Amino acid sequence: MSELNKLPPYMQILFNKIYQNKILTALFDDERIVKLAHFGIKKKIMKDLLRDVAKNAHVLQIGLTFGDEIDCIYQKVKKLGKLDVFDVSALQLEYAKNKYERKNIELANYNAALPWDEKYDVVICYNLLHELPLQTRRQVMDNVLNSLAMGGKAIFVDYAKPVWWQLLRYPLFVFNRLYRPFCESLWQQPLENFSSKKDGFRWQHSYYGGKLWQKTIAVPKILSNEDVKKLTKLFRGK
């Protein structure tokens, strides 16, 4: 097995029972289960996500997802654009080949912690970052940002820190401690802080369900912060 095809250790330890199990994969792929796991707010998240994807966009998604999320992206770009998907699980990719066999979706067994050459108009990480160890998360986010074409954007949909009145805040805290050890870090700081490239991008945050979820968009800055300061001084005659 090549370096590109190896299943990362964190996947083998934490998620092997789900992502390497055909029966559980089929169960969790049921859209009703997916909507339940989104606490009833997936429709709003997807509506906003699709608004951020142009019909002629060349899109890359990092990681396969359960439910109809990838199909919704495909339906948006199928006539004028293109959709590629990376994943590290051979079983999930095999399942996806059958699931999307009639759709022109390019599936690749590739670890996004390693850089790639192709540039994209939109790169999506949907419900992925909370599964990644901090170093891997930084590598993936940096590679995503490096792969944006001119005028491109990166879209990260993931968990956030729920507001104090959100009834699910405390059950989720306990669940994360037990089963999702890397998720709690998303409660502790803005998502952009996990990337070493953050200063070269502008970040826009949207929240859903009392901050159960976030959609964070990164777009490259045309001018750096230092350039803006210099121009401001110039216009003010300083």
Regions found by a protein language model. Name each.
Residues 114-118:
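Short conserved loop adjoining the S-adenosyl-L-methionine
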Residues 60-113:
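Class I SAM-dependent methyltransferase SAM/SAH-binding core
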Residues 37-56, 68, 72:
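Conserved alpha-helix/loop element of class I SAM-dependent methyltransferases that forms part
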Residues 156-198, 203-213:
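C-terminal alpha-helical "lid/dimerization" subdomain adjacent to the S-adenosyl-L-methionine
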Residues 199-238:
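Core SAM-dependent methyltransferase catalytic element
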Residues 124:
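A conserved beta-strand element that flanks and buttresses the S-adenosyl-L-methionine
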Residues 138-150:
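A short glycine-rich, Lys/Arg-flanked "PGG" loop and its adjoining helix->strand segment in the class I
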Residues 6-48:
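Class I SAM-dependent methyltransferase Rossmann-like catalytic core
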